[in-house]
Structures are given as structure tokens and as C-alpha cells.
Amino acid sequence: MKVIAAFLLALLGGNTSPTDEDLKSILASVGADADDDKIELLLSQVKGKDITELIASGRERLASVPSGGGVAVAAAAGGGGGDAPAAAAEEPKKEEKSEEESDEELGFSLFDDN
């Protein structure tokens, strides 16, 4: 990510085709280590491509990736109502109970005297 950030900073600074030395100097300015392999890979992947098209393509791909966190989504869908945080707080408790129940169903407990 730091190599990509350095590349984008170079572009924002007006450098239309940053070199590996440009990226290394940007990374060195903030005390970050420069990985030559990652820099070369990035430069080879973006060579001759428009950065705005690459970003748009990346956004489309990220939009199609399913994301976890159903509790966060449910809380966000609440629209800021006062009950949303309470509902989100109750969800993990229900999951913990089901895990305990599943252990009991298997007849396995860490604290059995058997």
C-alpha cells in the first residue's frame, strides 16, 4: 500500500510518469522502507495506463466483493435511531449462547469432571 500511496502522491504532485527513484525518495522522506520488487511490479502493472481508469476499475471490483459484518450493516441501516446500538450490542450475546449450546449438544465441556 505504501508503494501505491507514493505513486499516487507523485502523480498528484505533477509527475506524470514516476520512476522507481521518485517512489524511493517519497518513501524515504517519511522514513518508510522501499521494497524494490514491489516498486518494479507496480510500475510494470501501471505502465501505459490511465490512473483514473485504474481507480474506476478498482472501485467496480471492490463494489462486487461481499463484505462481512452483518451487525455493522444492521446498525447502519437503523438510520441513527436510538435503538440501533442496543440491537447491535445484543447480537454478540446471542451468538455466544449458541456456541455454548453447541458444546453441550456434543457432550463436550472443558470443565467436566469425567
UniProtKB/Swiss-Prot annotation:
Keywords: Phosphoprotein, Ribonucleoprotein, Ribosomal protein. GO terms for cellular component: cytosolic large ribosomal subunit. CDD domains: Ribosomal_P2 (cd05833). GO terms for molecular function: structural constituent of ribosome. Phosphorylated. Residues 74-83 have a biased composition (Gly residues). Residues 74-114 are annotated as: Disordered. One of its GO terms (biological process) is cytoplasmic translational elongation. Residues 98-114 have a biased composition (Acidic residues). InterPro entries: P1/P2_N_sf (IPR038716), Ribosomal_P1/P2 (IPR027534), Ribosomal_P2 (IPR044076). The keyword Ribosomal protein applies. Belongs to the eukaryotic ribosomal protein P1/P2 family. PANTHER family: 60S ACIDIC RIBOSOMAL PROTEIN FAMILY MEMBER, LARGE RIBOSOMAL SUBUNIT PROTEIN P2. Plays an important role in the elongation step of protein synthesis. P1 and P2 exist as dimers at the large ribosomal subunit. This is Large ribosomal subunit protein P2. It comes from Parthenium argentatum.
